[in-house]
């Protein structure tokens, strides 16, 4: 009993919004019941009338809608109205076949009116009218609207990344706020979803038109069989009775279908403005009196041709002339807008400001349009998250936060191409193919794979772009397999490390100093700028980063500078002193946990020769420089084969000279001095440069 009372109270507890939520399920239940349950003729009249009214409402809403997204529910409504018409066809077919022998009113007054009054009771005329309506709906309106929806969906989807990037650019420039950006992104997504849905929903209408023809044929044939075989009617009376009912049923269904198809065409062909379709049509068709005059002249000439219906043509000629005269008079009576006062020519152009100066980003990336989904968080792009992780990991490893990577699309690039820029200059580029995998050969992979051969952009190893299905096979053969976003992120990470010294500017030096001052205020207060200038500190830190030395241990760096800067102001000399102070960290960086360090060494005779050249102030002889470079390259190759770090150990005085000389040709080589190695490590020479 309590449950019954609760059910009776349910309608009073539902709010208007809750009734709106139930509208969809109620309509589905109604459609299903129409297909399953036999309905009386009066209920069919109500449902046919409701279908006609609904189609007219949909058309009027489409006409008065100013923007496509104002009627975003149209694809769903199109589906429901199609199902409603098909359900009505099923219900009316059932009652026509069951009660058609009783007379013209067997399927209700609406079907009778459409079958008798609209076509004069002549079933041949009814069949012709029905077929014409189906052809208009199927071949003209629906086909055209479907094609427009297909092309519109394609263009909307192609333009979606550009719109997203434009919104991000406006947001970054401060032209819009975060809420407005979210609203615009939502509208762009809704527009793409709408046209994509319309592309598919148009197929429902075409299928409905085909179903209407088949249902008519089935009704006529079935009616003849039922009337003749079951009810003993003659073939002529059965054909007349059942065919007229079928024609009425078909017309009462096809006319709303034609109206709905017209509404679909209006929706997909309209242009989003501040005017509805009627205002656009009237305003643009009848705005020019010259057009009316020319049209009147053409009709007047046709009206004077012998044998033509002169009265009709001349009536329309007079109407168009009157319309042109009225439009011309309205233009002449329109109040003239006050003309703005013209400023002198030299003041008419807005003066340039400093806001017009575009500064280059410290670090940027440009991508082709195929790579835009990788950097769009709304499309689950992983690259943005990877870049954030790269910056965080780099800050933890090297001791400073690299600049933000500004990403933008560049339609001049190849679709799968990307470029990495530093201060507006390209420092790296490559190709990436979303959905495919890069199989990198580390030198030990066996066999080959089908795909596009390329080179790993970060380390220059041979690689192949393969399909996802070949991923496991590539791993079995010894390839290192990574996805497209990982390729780009690894390349970016490699370049940030390679150019870390250039990315560390005075601004970053000051920010790092401010961060250190929070922990050690007394040290920084006494040191900068009293003992060492910010310029000198910046140069020392840059020198360390240029040789891959982390600057995390700022306490040691600042204390060393505080001790030696009063005696030495040369940044390169101060860098050498700081490197010795950071010796344990440098040793740990290249030889973690190894008591024995395997390094490349210099022959004693070559070392003496280099020291003499350094003390004499002269440069290296060209022949000696070439031999030194060639032997270093050979030793480095042997070092890599042993799996040892690419480290060259030299005399402390020679380290800066050899580092600058060899780093140009062998950027992977690390030059350490004997003073920078920890005392508790045992040194083993794997190769000697300059030896016999």
Swiss-Prot record:
<dbReference type="InterPro" id="IPR042196">
    <property type="entry name" value="FHIPEP_4"/>
</dbReference>
<keyword id="KW-1003">Cell membrane</keyword>
<dbReference type="InterPro" id="IPR001712">
    <property type="entry name" value="T3SS_FHIPEP"/>
</dbReference>
<keyword id="KW-1133">Transmembrane helix</keyword>
<feature type="transmembrane region" description="Helical">
    <location>
        <begin position="24"/>
        <end position="44"/>
    </location>
</feature>
<dbReference type="InterPro" id="IPR006301">
    <property type="entry name" value="FlhA"/>
</dbReference>
<comment type="similarity">
    <text>Belongs to the FHIPEP (flagella/HR/invasion proteins export pore) family.</text>
</comment>
<feature type="transmembrane region" description="Helical">
    <location>
        <begin position="247"/>
        <end position="267"/>
    </location>
</feature>
<keyword id="KW-0653">Protein transport</keyword>
<feature type="transmembrane region" description="Helical">
    <location>
        <begin position="121"/>
        <end position="141"/>
    </location>
</feature>
<keyword id="KW-1005">Bacterial flagellum biogenesis</keyword>
<feature type="transmembrane region" description="Helical">
    <location>
        <begin position="209"/>
        <end position="229"/>
    </location>
</feature>
<keyword id="KW-0472">Membrane</keyword>
<keyword id="KW-0813">Transport</keyword>
<keyword id="KW-0997">Cell inner membrane</keyword>
<feature type="transmembrane region" description="Helical">
    <location>
        <begin position="296"/>
        <end position="316"/>
    </location>
</feature>
<dbReference type="Pfam" id="PF00771">
    <property type="entry name" value="FHIPEP"/>
</dbReference>
<dbReference type="GO" id="GO:0009306">
    <property type="term" value="P:protein secretion"/>
</dbReference>
<feature type="transmembrane region" description="Helical">
    <location>
        <begin position="95"/>
        <end position="115"/>
    </location>
</feature>
<dbReference type="InterPro" id="IPR042193">
    <property type="entry name" value="FHIPEP_3"/>
</dbReference>
<feature type="transmembrane region" description="Helical">
    <location>
        <begin position="46"/>
        <end position="66"/>
    </location>
</feature>
<dbReference type="InterPro" id="IPR042194">
    <property type="entry name" value="FHIPEP_1"/>
</dbReference>
<dbReference type="InterPro" id="IPR025505">
    <property type="entry name" value="FHIPEP_CS"/>
</dbReference>
<protein>
    <recommendedName>
        <fullName>Flagellar biosynthesis protein FlhA</fullName>
    </recommendedName>
</protein>
<keyword id="KW-0812">Transmembrane</keyword>
<keyword id="KW-1006">Bacterial flagellum protein export</keyword>
<dbReference type="GO" id="GO:0005886">
    <property type="term" value="C:plasma membrane"/>
</dbReference>
<dbReference type="GO" id="GO:0044780">
    <property type="term" value="P:bacterial-type flagellum assembly"/>
</dbReference>
<comment type="function">
    <text>Required for formation of the rod structure of the flagellar apparatus. Together with FliI and FliH, may constitute the export apparatus of flagellin.</text>
</comment>
<feature type="transmembrane region" description="Helical">
    <location>
        <begin position="71"/>
        <end position="91"/>
    </location>
</feature>
């Amino acid at each position: 009993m309590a449950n019954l009372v609760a059910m009776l109270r349910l309608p009073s507890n539902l709010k208007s919004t809750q009734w709106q939520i139930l509208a969809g399920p109620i309509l589905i239940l109604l459609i299903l019941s129409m297909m399953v349950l036999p309905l009386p003729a009066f209920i069919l009249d109500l449902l046919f009338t409701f279908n006609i009214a609904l189609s007219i409402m949909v058309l009027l809403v489409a006409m008065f809608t100013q923007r496509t997204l104002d009627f975003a529910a149209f694809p769903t409504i199109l589906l429901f109205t199609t199902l409603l018409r098909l359900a009505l066809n099923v219900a009316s077919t059932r009652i026509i076949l069951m009660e058609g022998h009783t007379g013209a009113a067997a399927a209700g007054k609406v079907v009778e009116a459409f079958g008798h009054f609209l076509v004069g009771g002549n079933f041949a005329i009814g069949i012709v009218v029905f077929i014409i309506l189906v052809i208009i709906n199927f071949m003209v309106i629906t086909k055209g609207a479907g094609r427009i929806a297909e092309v519109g969906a394609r263009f909307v989807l192609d333009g979606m990344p550009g719109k997203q990037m434009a919104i991000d650019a406006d947001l970054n420039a401060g032209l819009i706020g975060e809420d407005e950006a979210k609203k615009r992104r939502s509208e762009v997504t809704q527009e793409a979803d709408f046209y994509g849905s319309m592309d598919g929903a148009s197929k429902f209408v075409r299928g409905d038109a085909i179903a209407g023809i088949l249902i008519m044929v089935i009704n006529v044939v079935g009616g003849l069989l039922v009337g003749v075989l079951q009810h003993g009617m003659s073939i002529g009376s059965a054909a007349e009775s059942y065919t007229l009912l079928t024609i009425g049923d078909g017309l009462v269904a096809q006319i709303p279908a034609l109206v709905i198809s017209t509404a679909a065409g209006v929706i997909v062909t309209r242009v989003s403005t501040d005017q509805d379709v009627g205002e656009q049509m009237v305003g643009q068709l009848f705005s020019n009196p010259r057009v009316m005059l020319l049209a009147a002249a053409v009709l007047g000439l046709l009206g004077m041709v012998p044998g033509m219906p002169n009265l009709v043509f001349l009536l329309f000629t007079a109407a168009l002339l009157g319309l042109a005269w009225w439009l011309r008079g309205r233009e002449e009576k329109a109040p003239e807008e006050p003309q703005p006062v013209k400023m002198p020519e030299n003041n008419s152009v807005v003066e340039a400001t400093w806001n017009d100066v575009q500064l280059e980003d410290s670090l940027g990336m440009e991508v082709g349009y195929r790579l835009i989904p990788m950097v769009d968080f709304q499309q689950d792009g992983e690259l943005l998250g990877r870049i954030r992780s790269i910056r965080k990991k780099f800050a933890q490893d090297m001791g400073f936060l690299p600049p933000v990577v500004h990403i933008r699309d560049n339609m001049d690039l190849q679709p799968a191409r990307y470029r990495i820029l530093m201060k507006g200059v390209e420092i790296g580029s490559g190709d990436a193919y979303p959905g495919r995998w890069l199989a990198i050969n580390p030198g030990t992979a066996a066999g080959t794979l089908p795909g596009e051969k390329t080179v790993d952009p970060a380390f220059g190893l041979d690689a192949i772009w393969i399909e996802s299905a070949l991923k496991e096979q590539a791993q079995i053969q010894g390839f290192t397999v990574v996805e497209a976003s990982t390729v780009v992120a690894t390349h970016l990470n490699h370049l940030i490390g390679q150019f870390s010294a250039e990315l560390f500017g005075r601004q970053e030096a000051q920010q790092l100093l401010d961060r250190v001052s929070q922990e050690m205020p007394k040290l920084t207060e006494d040191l900068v700028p009293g003992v060492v200038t910010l310029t000198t500190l910046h140069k020392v830190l840059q020198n360390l980063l240029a040789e891959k030395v982390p600057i995390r241990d700022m306490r040691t760096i600042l204390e060393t500078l505080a001790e030696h800067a009063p005696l030495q102001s040369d940044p390169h000399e101060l860098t050498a002193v700081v490197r010795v102070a950071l010796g344990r960290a440098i040793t740990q960086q290249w030889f973690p946990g190894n008591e024995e360090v395997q390094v490349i060494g210099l022959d004693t005779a070559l070392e003496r020769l280099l020291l003499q050249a350094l003390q004499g102030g002269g440069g290296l002889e060209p022949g000696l420089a070439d031999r030194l470079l060639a032997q270093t390259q050979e030793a480095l190759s042997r070092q890599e084969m042993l799996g040892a770090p690419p480290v060259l150990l030299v005399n402390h005085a020679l380290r800066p000279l050899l580092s600058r000389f060899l780093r140009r040709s062998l950027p992977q080589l690390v030059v350490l001095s004997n003073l920078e190695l920890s005392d508790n490590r045992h040194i083993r020479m794997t190769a000697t440069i300059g030896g016999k």
